[in-house]
Amino acid sequence: MSKYYPLINKNSEFDAVILCDGDYPSAEIPLHILRNANFICCCDGAGNKYIRRGKIPNAIVGDGDSMSKNFKRKYKDIIHIETEQDTNDQTKATRFCINKGFKNIAYLGATGKREDHTLGNIGHLTNYRKEFNIKSVMLTDYGYFVSAQGNCRFASFKGQQVSFFNIDCSKFESKGTKWKTHAYKYWWQGTLNEALGDEIEIKSDGSFLVFRTYLSKQDSLGRRHL
């Protein structure tokens, strides 16, 4: 049976939200999810940003290199330092949330700033699905990434912009997309496809990433000219 991935909107609910230290969310959907989160775990320096906006997270997790001594003293009850350097702060925060029993996790602020951090954060989604068996979504100001494997169905809408990033598939076929897909050798080859209707079906034999936009291409162009 194929796994189903729903659309993400401002009413989507998650067990926990992990706020990373990239560009702070500014679009309506990620901000609404952040404001209404059941549990907020900030990655290291993201705790500073969140608190400066008048909020207190449930936890701040990381190696502590972005926090001052005064900050650490003031918020010692919610700060959890992990000094090992084999993983990044996003992964440390993920492990923390999993240990709390959370399995459905949204990542915000994971993109922007340094591009190597952005690629690393996105790439970790595949590891989290395989190693931790969690359901995760990474939201940006424009859309959202999910990691998937095998045969899957993705909720969509006509004109939604969709990009596919092959990880290890030798077979990758789609139904409901404007352009035919295959097991892409390079990441750029699967970008900028488009949904024809309310569902995209993927038949594959491996892992891949999917990015779906909040708006259709036409809506995006209209919003740009407002």
Please provide the spans of the model-predicted regions.
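N-terminal beta-strand-loop-alpha-helix module at the start
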Residues: 1-71
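Solvent-exposed alpha-helices and their adjacent loops that cap or buttress functional pockets
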Residues: 7-12, 32-35, 53, 99, ...
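Mobile, glycine- and charge-enriched loop segments
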Residues: 12-15, 39, 63, 67-82, ...
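Structural motif
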Residues: 15-17, 20-22, 38-39, 58-59, 77, 111, 213-214, ...
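Acidic/Gly/His-enriched mid-domain segments of enzyme catalytic cores or analogous surface patches
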Residues: 36, 45-131
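Conserved phosphate- and dinucleotide-binding cores of soluble alpha/beta proteins
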Residues: 97, 116-158, 219-220, 224-225
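Long, charged alpha-helical interface segments
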Residues: 141, 148-226
